[in-house]
């Protein structure tokens, strides 16, 4: 049930889709049923799944996949194929060709629109909620309404929501229904209708609109929900034997220890009605599929566990689009619906295989590719760029799984003969072509999506190649370690996981290569590492919980704050509440930090990247008009939607609830924020003009003295591009253009070309800020009235902050003037020091740098010569160990280059075999180490790279290199003498063991 998946702290991993995982043992399935509190695990034993089951693999169902029309054809393959035909051909009066995924989605939305529901667009996969990692349920965008934190905008709504879940990623492709990306169709009521309408409409939709045979539908209800049972049986007409009463774990949804809760009811489709009711416990995953979920929010759970009826009863439902498509299109799994299968077909053609004749392993890999490509396309479209942290890592991991899976099944290069190309863009093209109904914006971001996928794939292919090199080194170490201790060579589970997770090496390939070299693989250790990662991934999803009880009662009772700051910087207001250390008080005295709630305010509360205003609140005497209290406000935040929280310190007197105060915003700081906010809009327009319209905002900060703008782009900007961007912004500033602001319908604003921030939450009415002919954005921030007020714009820095994300920092307004004046002062000082004019500074600096480079080269050359002279004397001190000449010495303050020259000289001078290990501490708190081994020593199996790396650890560092030559460093020069002594002992022992 999706509400439970989103809200229950004990069941946040619960999926609205029954989860199937297969155990290693044959003929044994563990079915995880969707639960509200915890998972119920059933063990289905005995015989294998019957041939002909829609959920089976292999040769159970033989189908022609030549076209979408043919994909519904079933061919008898066993005695039970009559059941297969019964389970598929009886679905509805319409042919499978009528029920495309788009048609199902449209029918669902239109059905509820005809019943008074407002069709709302899918929200972003990046939720407007810091407690939620990714959008995992359709009700997420309505969460504040369900919790009473925001007023309802419409009485009831219907959506098709994009969702991402990766906590069971290893099951994708291996079961019939696990997916990372899916669509959740839903209808929602915010106190408008309740149980009877939800149930009867759900039945009408499934049986009349979609034409599902009523005799194939089973119902689950909460064991104590007699009302729902009665509606299903007495009003809808479902026989009692097909209505199952289940317990609290299965059919009762809670939002946490306290808060909104209620029973739920689920509709299941029966693939094998001829089996009767003997085993019909709805837990048979091969027989039943749950596809529609109705949650009845009717109670409030109190601290003592008791339930009280809610004043406003709500409805939250979810229907898995892919599941309904599977039923109506008569295919054996979600992947073979028209929502995913075109991507699979494309991947199969690139791998030069036929899905129809492919074995189970090949089909599994193709399903993984089909599923993951949908996920990455929608995530990147919603502004999630591949990186090593947070949501970016989810995208990167999915992309890498597709790349390594594609390579595993034989896709090379671009899949069309170009070995240097990338194949993900071709697959993404198919996914994008399927996106127009659910998210039309994906098509407009095609260029950006394809470019990001190509760059990420080519980078990862290089990583894979490095992984091959690492695997060779790890196998060498395993063989060497086994040789030293007499054990059997083994590749540790941690190393296998490193190759799998970081370098994308499939475990089976690692095991195969290791086996060829006689090395076993620690699969138990690998499984433990995988389980640890799974738990971490699960934890990321389990942060989805409500803040019910975290807000004090005073905040909940305060009405929204009226914002006056667009038109005025001062106002008279009434104190509606006071908080000190989170506790509600009536009076606060001098010296206390306080949070103040007003009925109205000119102070801007932090949002949209713009910081909250600073200023003062004043309390005056009623008779003498003298100041009785002064409160300095240093921050303003929003709480529970649109309640402004003024945070500050009582500088004088006291403030009391119910009293009138005068509020005054710091005008100079507000002007700085206005200049930087408008400059941010101009900067975004300039970026789109100079480097391409596909770039998009990834974040921003609008402060009083600076701005920071993060944007999605794959490379650093050149100096020329930065100059053009800066020049264009200043051109717009000097044009003295008047800004226009207006409030309009969201869709009208988008149609007019207004830019919306990815993932930002907007109401039906939005504020649009326009610089005519330059910029139009949805924005609730404060802005200058004319671009001339910005005064000037200067880019301070441009840098990368994550893979595919760049950041520009800049100044405008008074901060721009201060910055330019400071830079001018720096230039004056520089000219004075160099004794040149400003225009000659660059040339003079280049001359000085060239002279410095020449001097450094000369010094380095002299140091190397001195080091070689020292080395010449060391050659005479070499010891002989079993015919091998050995030199281990501390060369004092010789630098790394000199140390290298000395080692090369010694190993060339001494007769082969020879081993030279030198160390030095140049006096800068660092240690340099070098090892040079002649061919004779290398043939003994003694490698310089591994040897010097181990010694360097004693000096607080590390390093490595080739078998014959390696360098290392450290930061503990005091440990150098001891490290060299250990090096001497180990090289002597190694040579002696090889010679004996």
From Swiss-Prot:
SUPFAM superfamilies annotated for this entry? Answer: Class II aaRS and biotin synthetases, Putative anticodon-binding domain of alanyl-tRNA synthetase (AlaRS), ThrRS/AlaRS common domain, Translation proteins
Which GO CC terms are listed, alphabetically? Answer: chloroplast; cytosol; mitochondrion
Required co-factor?
Answer: Zn(2+)
Q: Which residues bind Zn(2+)?
A: 677, 681, 779, 783
**Keyword field:** Aminoacyl-tRNA synthetase, ATP-binding, Chloroplast, Ligase, Metal-binding, Mitochondrion, Nucleotide-binding, Plastid, Protein biosynthesis, RNA-binding, Transit peptide, tRNA-binding, Zinc
InterPro entries, per database record: aa-tRNA-synth_II/BPL/LPL (IPR045864), Ala-tRNA-lgiase_IIc (IPR002318), Ala-tRNA-ligase_IIc_anticod-bd (IPR018162), Ala-tRNA-synth_IIc_core (IPR018165), Ala-tRNA-synth_IIc_N (IPR018164), Ala-tRNA_ligase (IPR050058), Ala_tRNA_ligase_euk/bac (IPR023033), Ala_tRNA_synth_plant (IPR027522)
Quaternary structure note = Monomer.
Top-level class of the enzyme under EC nomenclature: ligase
Q: Quote the cofactor binding remark.
A: Binds 1 zinc ion per subunit.
Give an example GO biological process: alanyl-tRNA aminoacylation
EC numbers on record = 6.1.1.7
- Catalytic activity reported: tRNA(Ala) + L-alanine + ATP = L-alanyl-tRNA(Ala) + AMP + diphosphate
Q: Does the keyword Protein biosynthesis apply?
A: yes
Q: Which PANTHER family match?
A: ALANINE--TRNA LIGASE, CYTOPLASMIC (PTHR11777:SF9), ALANYL-TRNA SYNTHETASE (PTHR11777)
> What name has this protein been given in UniProt?
Alanine--tRNA ligase, chloroplastic/mitochondrial
Keyword Glycoprotein attributed: no
Record's family?
Belongs to the class-II aminoacyl-tRNA synthetase family.
The domain-related comment in the record is: Consists of three domains; the N-terminal catalytic domain, the editing domain and the C-terminal C-Ala domain. The editing domain removes incorrectly charged amino acids, while the C-Ala domain, along with tRNA(Ala), serves as a bridge to cooperatively bring together the editing and aminoacylation centers thus stimulating deacylation of misacylated tRNAs.
Q: Where in the cell is it found?
A: Plastid, Chloroplast; Mitochondrion
Q: Name one GO molecular function term.
A: zinc ion binding
Reported function? Catalyzes the attachment of alanine to tRNA(Ala) in a two-step reaction: alanine is first activated by ATP to form Ala-AMP and then transferred to the acceptor end of tRNA(Ala). Also edits incorrectly charged tRNA(Ala) via its editing domain.
Predominant location category: plastid
Q: Name one Pfam family in it.
A: tRNA-synt_2c
């Amino acid at each position: 049930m999706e509400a439970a998946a989103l809200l229950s702290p004990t069941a946040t991993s619960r999926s609205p889709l029954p989860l199937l995982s297969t155990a290693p043992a044959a003929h044994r399935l563990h079915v995880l049923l969707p639960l509200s509190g915890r998972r119920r695990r059933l063990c289905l034993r005995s015989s294998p799944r019957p041939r002909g089951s829609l959920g089976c693999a292999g040769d159970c169902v033989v189908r022609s996949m030549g076209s979408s029309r043919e994909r519904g054809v079933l061919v008898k393959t066993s005695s039970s194929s009559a059941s297969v035909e019964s389970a598929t051909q009886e679905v509805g009066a319409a042919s499978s060709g009528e029920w495309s995924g788009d048609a199902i989605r449209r029918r669902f939305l239109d059905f509820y629109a005809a019943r008074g529901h407002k069709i709302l667009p899918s929200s972003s996969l990046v939720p407007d909620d810091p407690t939620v990692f990714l959008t995992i349920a359709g009700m997420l965008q309505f969460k504040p309404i369900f919790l009473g934190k925001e007023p309802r905008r419409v009485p009831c709504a219907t959506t098709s929501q994009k969702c991402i879940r990766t906590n069971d990623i290893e099951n994708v492709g291996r079961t019939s229904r696990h997916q990372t990306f899916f669509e959740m169709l839903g209808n929602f009521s915010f106190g408008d209708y309740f149980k009877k309408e939800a149930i009867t409409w759900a039945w009408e939709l499934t049986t009349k609109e979609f034409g599902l045979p009523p005799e194939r539908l089973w119902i689950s209800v909460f064991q104590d929900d007699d009302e729902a049972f009665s509606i299903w049986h007495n009003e809808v007409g479902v026989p009692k034997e097909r209505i199952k009463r289940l317990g609290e774990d299965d059919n009762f949804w809670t939002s946490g220890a306290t808060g909104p809760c209620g029973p739920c009811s689920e509709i299941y489709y029966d693939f094998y009605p001829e089996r009767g009711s003997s085993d019909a416990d709805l837990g048979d995953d091969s027989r039943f599929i749950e596809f529609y979920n109705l949650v009845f929010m009717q109670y409030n759970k109190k601290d003592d566990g008791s339930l009280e009826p809610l004043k406003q009863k709500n409805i939250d439902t979810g229907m898995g689009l892919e599941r309904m498509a599977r039923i109506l299109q008569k295919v054996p799994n979600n992947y073979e619906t028209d929502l995913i299968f075109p991507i699979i077909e494309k991947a199969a053609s690139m791998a030069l295989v036929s899905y129809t004749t492919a074995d189970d392993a090949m089909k599994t890999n193709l399903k993984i590719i089909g599923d993951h490509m949908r996920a990455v396309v929608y995530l990147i479209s919603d502004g999630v760029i591949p990186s090593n942290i947070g949501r970016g890592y989810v995208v990167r991991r999915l992309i890498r799984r597709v790349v390594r899976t594609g390579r595993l099944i034989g896709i090379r290069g671009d899949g069309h003969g170009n070995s240097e190309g990338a194949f993900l863009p071709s697959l993404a093209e198919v996914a994008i072509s399927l996106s127009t109904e659910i998210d039309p914006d994906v098509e407009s971001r095609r260029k950006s999506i394809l470019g990001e996928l190509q760059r990420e794939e080519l980078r990862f292919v290089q990583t894979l190649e490095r992984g091959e090199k690492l695997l060779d080194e790890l196998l060498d170490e395993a063989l060497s370690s086994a040789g030293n201790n007499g054990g059997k060579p083994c590749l540790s589970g941690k190393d296998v996981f490193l190759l799998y997770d970081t370098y994308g090496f499939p475990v089976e390939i690692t095991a195969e290569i290791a086996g060829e070299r006689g090395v076993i693989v620690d699969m138990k250790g690998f499984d433990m590492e995988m389980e640890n990662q799974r738990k971490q991934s699960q934890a990321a999803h389990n942060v989805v919980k409500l803040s019910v009880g975290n807000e004090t009662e005073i905040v909940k009772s305060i009405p929204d704050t009226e914002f006056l700051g667009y038109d005025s910087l001062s106002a008279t207001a009434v104190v509606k509440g006071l908080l000190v250390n989170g506790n509600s008080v009536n009076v606060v005295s001098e010296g206390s930090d306080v949070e103040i709630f007003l009925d109205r305010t000119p102070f801007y509360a932090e949002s949209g990247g713009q910081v909250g205003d600073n200023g003062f609140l004043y309390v005056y005497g009623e008779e003498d008009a003298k100041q009785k209290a002064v409160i300095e406000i240093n921050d303003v935040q929003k709480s529970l939607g649109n309640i402004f929280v003024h945070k500050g310190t009582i500088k004088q007197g006291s403030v009391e609830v119910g009293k009138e105060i005068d509020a005054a915003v710091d005008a100079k700081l507000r002007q700085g924020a206005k200049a930087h906010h408008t400059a941010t809009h101009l900067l975004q327009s300039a970026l789109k003009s100079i480097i391409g319209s596909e770039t998009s905002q990834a974040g921003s900060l609008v402060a009083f003295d600076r701005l920071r703008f993060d944007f999605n782009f794959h490379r650093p900007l050149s100096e020329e591009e930065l100059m053009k961007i800066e020049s264009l912004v200043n051109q717009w500033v000097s044009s003295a253009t008047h800004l226009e602001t207006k409030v309009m319908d969201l869709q009208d604003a988008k149609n007019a070309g207004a830019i919306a921030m990815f993932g930002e939450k907007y109401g039906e009415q939005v504020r649009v800020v326009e610089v005519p002919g330059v910029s139009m954005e949805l924005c609730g921030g404060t802005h200058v009235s004319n671009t001339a007020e910005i005064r000037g714009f200067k880019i301070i820095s441009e840098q990368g902050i994550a893979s595919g994300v760049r950041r520009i920092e800049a100044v405008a307004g008074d901060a721009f003037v201060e910055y330019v004046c400071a830079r001018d002062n720096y230039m004056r000082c520089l000219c004075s020091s160099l004794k040149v004019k400003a225009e000659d500074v660059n040339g003079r600096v280049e001359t000085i740098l060239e002279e410095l480079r020449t001097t450094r080269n000369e010094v380095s050359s002299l140091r190397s010569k001195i080091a070689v002279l020292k080395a010449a004397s060391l050659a005479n001190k070499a010891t002989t160990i079993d015919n091998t000449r050995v030199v281990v010495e501390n060369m004092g303050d010789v630098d790394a280059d000199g140390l290298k020259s000395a080692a090369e000289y010694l190993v060339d001078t001494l007769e082969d075999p020879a081993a030279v290990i030198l160390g030095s501490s140049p006096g800068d708190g660092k240690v340099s180490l070098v090892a040079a081994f002649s061919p004779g020593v290398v043939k003994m199996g003694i490698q310089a790279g591994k040897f010097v790396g181990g010694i360097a650890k004693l000096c607080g560092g590390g390093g490595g290199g080739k078998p014959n030559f390696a360098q290392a460093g450290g930061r503990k020069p005091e440990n150098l003498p001891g490290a060299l002594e250990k090096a001497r002992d180990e090289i002597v022992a190694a040579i002696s063991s090889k010679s004996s």
